């Protein structure tokens, strides 16, 4: 609770400073000397967009193309579940044209910001809005996998313990891309045709990825997998699998001795040979279980961040998801 009060105080300071110092901004990047009677895409200021974490950044960048400057808020080496904005982050969000975030409880800091920016120019896209959001899984629930009951259509900001990891299902990622496209088109109607074309091109790649998952996981020997935390419920539901998470929705949540025992028993009973861990948190619990049952550990990436080095190597959502598919195929056919 204290961290949200601190965030609220920072918001008040930022808004006061912004009100005192705001002035028209000139985009110096677009200095094309076209006749001023009709703006073209070369002379219009680009949209300034803040995206909460990597999937939102990638989806937005693919749709916006060169019509916007898209920046990511949460650094690649920081777990998004834990991140809180600084005063500088809040100022940058407040001065942006658009904030793109996943929602469904992923970014707990968003509601404070939105409640304090009423009346500002800031528009928002909750990319998961309108999707069927799953209930989360509690730490002490049974080890037979994720709660997969659908939740009501996601139309509010009262998320509770919902599962926010919708981007890990390519089929749902498509819907998030459409939500982003629609808001970009509303903000910049003159570029709506470009946004639609960009979205269609990227969605075609996501549809191909979706088919690769369907075909690649259809005839595996087993359908259950053990993973570090409950991030893969949507992927499991979409492709007929069962995730067995060591921890709940929070990746750094320490499982109880009872839960660890349940996971070990499940792994032994079902002859599990691979325990999945992820990149932004310690793999100690996964390694402990793997060691106890004589299994190996492997990465299943929740795609919550990529490094600048990975970007330079053209690592992206599509390539990481294909790595996840390959890892699942290998583990489920052992």
Question: What would you call each of these model-derived segments?
Answer:
Residues 2-7, 20-334:
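Extracytoplasmic metal-acquisition and chelation regions
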């Amino acid at each position: 609770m204290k961290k949200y009060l601190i965030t609220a105080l920072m918001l008040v300071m930022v808004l006061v400073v912004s009100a005192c110092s705001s002035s028209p901004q000139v985009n110096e990047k677009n200095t094309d000397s076209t006749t001023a009677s009709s703006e073209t895409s070369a002379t219009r200021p680009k949209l300034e967009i803040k995206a909460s974490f990597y999937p939102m950044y990638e989806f937005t960048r693919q749709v916006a193309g060169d019509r916007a400057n898209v920046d990511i808020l949460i650094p690649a080496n920081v777990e998004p579940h834990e991140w809180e904005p600084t005063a500088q982050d809040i100022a940058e969000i407040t001065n942006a044209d658009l904030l793109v975030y996943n929602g469904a409880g992923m970014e707990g800091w968003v509601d404070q910001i939105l409640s304090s920016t009423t009346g500002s120019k800031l528009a928002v896209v909750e990319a998961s809005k309108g999707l069927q959001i799953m209930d989360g899984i509690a730490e002490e629930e049974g080890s037979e996998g994720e709660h997969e009951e659908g939740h009501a259509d996601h139309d509010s900001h009262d998320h509770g313990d919902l599962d926010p990891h919708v981007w890990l299902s390519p089929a749902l990622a498509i819907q998030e891309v459409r939500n982003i496209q629609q808001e970009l088109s509303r903000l910049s109607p003159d570029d709506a045709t470009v946004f639609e074309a960009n979205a269609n091109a990227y969605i075609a790649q996501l549809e191909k990825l979706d088919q690769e998952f369907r075909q690649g996981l259809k005839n595996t020997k087993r359908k259950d997998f053990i993973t570090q935390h409950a991030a893969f419920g949507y992927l499991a539901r979409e492709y007929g699998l069962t995730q067995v998470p060591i921890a709940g929705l929070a990746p750094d949540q320490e499982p109880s001795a009872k839960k660890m025992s349940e996971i070990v028993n499940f792994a032994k009973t079902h002859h599990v040979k691979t325990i999945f861990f992820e990149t932004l948190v310690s793999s100690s619990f996964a390694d402990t279980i793997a060691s106890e049952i004589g299994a190996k550990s492997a990465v299943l990436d929740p795609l919550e961040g990529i490094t600048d080095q990975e970007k330079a190597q053209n690592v992206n959502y599509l390539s990481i998801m294909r790595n996840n598919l390959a890892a699942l195929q290998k583990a489920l056919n052992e």
